[in-house]
Every structure is written in C-alpha cells, then in structure tokens.
Regions:
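Hydrophobic ligand-binding cavity/cleft-lining segments
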Residues: 1-73
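Beta-strand residues in well-ordered beta-sheet regions across diverse protein folds
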Residues: 22-24, 84, 132-134
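Hydrophobic-ligand binding "helix-grip"
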Residues: 69-127
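Short, highly charged C-terminal tails/helix-capping segments
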Residues: 171-187
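Structured surface interface patches that mediate subunit assembly and partner/cofactor docking
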Residues: 3-4, 38, 44-48, 70, ...
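Glycine-rich, low-complexity intrinsically disordered segments
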Residues: 28, 32, 80-87, 97-99, ...
Length: 187
C-alpha cells in the first residue's frame, strides 16, 4: 500500500534460517505474552467492547488474524506474507473484513480504514535472518481519517507496545528452536 496515513515498521535480526523464523512467526500465539493480553484487555475496557465471548483458543498469529477476518493479499512461502482488511477501529467491537487482493488497491467504501500488515524474512547469511513486521493504514475518506487519527493518537501506544513485545519473543523462540534442532542433528 504505497499511500498510507500511518506506517509502523519493526525488525529484528534472528540467528535462525528464514524458514524457521517464518514458521515461528506464523505459529506464535500472540496472547501467550501476558503484557500483550493486558494491552488487548485494556483496549476492550477503554473502548467499551462488550458482548459474549467464547473461550479463547490458543492459535498462531496468522491463524488468529485470519479467524478475525483478515485476508491474505500476498503469500510467498518462507519470505513474505501480506494480510489486509478494512474496518472501523474506533469502535469497541472492531470487525475486520477481508478485501480480495485484486480489489484492495481500489477499495474505497466510505468511513473505513484499509489496513495491511506483513511478515517478511530476508536471508542475511547462512542461519541469520532479518525479520520485518510492518503495518500500514489508510482511511478511505476525510471523515474516516479524522476518526482514525483521533483513535490512533492514543491506541498507537498499545499497538506499538505489542510489536515491541512480540518481535523479541519470536526471535527467542526461533533461535531456541533452531539451536535445539541443530544440537539434535549433530548428536
């Protein structure tokens, strides 16, 4: 998404091959990190998100976001995943709706925000990977932009904190998995 209202990019160097890093990111249970669960609960409290909740099942990052309504725009195994949706994030019970990849660029339903997020791996050298997670959002009209920027003015702190907590956790798990696998292979 070349045109955007906000862009947040986070990256880590991980001592593991790209396929281990990407699989770890796909399978990582975002809410397994207590402070992330607290941030999500705090948003729900602040925004007055209510309704009945079914018991949460531990899902990987990609499975959970797809279950929430995100669609896949681009997927290159072990290299790149780009997911996108439209929503009105200023509501407590935000509903993400996937946009087909071939319609995403021209999607302009009023009073919506288009959001893309990506996971990307780049091999730096053998068993060393640059892992990037990026989020971009673009409001479809001026009224949506006004609402979104007001929401973003405070919500970004939690959203950014989630990424700051998530990437090191993915790094630790991928490096641990790679080290364990390497030790098993040499034994």
């Amino acid at each position: 998404m070349p045109k955007f209202d906000i862009r947040e990019r986070f990256e880590k160097i991980i001592n593991a091959p790209v396929e281990v890093v990407m699989r770890t990111a796909y399978d990582f249970d975002l809410q397994s990190i207590l402070p992330i669960r607290a941030i999500i609960s705090m948003r729900e409290l602040i925004m007055g998100a209510g309704g009945e909740k079914s018991p949460r099942k531990a899902l990987g990052l990609v499975a959970e976001t797809r279950a929430l309504g995100w669609g896949t725009l681009v997927e290159v195994p072990n290299q790149l995943l780009v997911c996108g949706a439209h929503c009105q994030p200023w509501f407590g019970n935000v509903k993400f709706t996937a946009i087909p990849a071939d319609e995403f660029a021209v999607f302009d339903l009023p009073d919506q925000v288009k959001i893309v997020w990506s996971l990307e791996t780049t091999k730096i050298e053998t068993n060393k990977t640059r892992f990037v997670h990026e989020v971009r959002a673009f409001a479809t009209d001026d009224e949506a932009r006004r609402k979104f920027m007001r929401y973003w003015s405070w919500a970004r702190f939690g959203i950014i904190a989630i990424r700051i907590l998530l990437l090191p956790a993915i790094r630790r798990r991928a490096e641990h998995e790679w080290k364990s696998r390497s030790e098993t292979d040499t034994a």
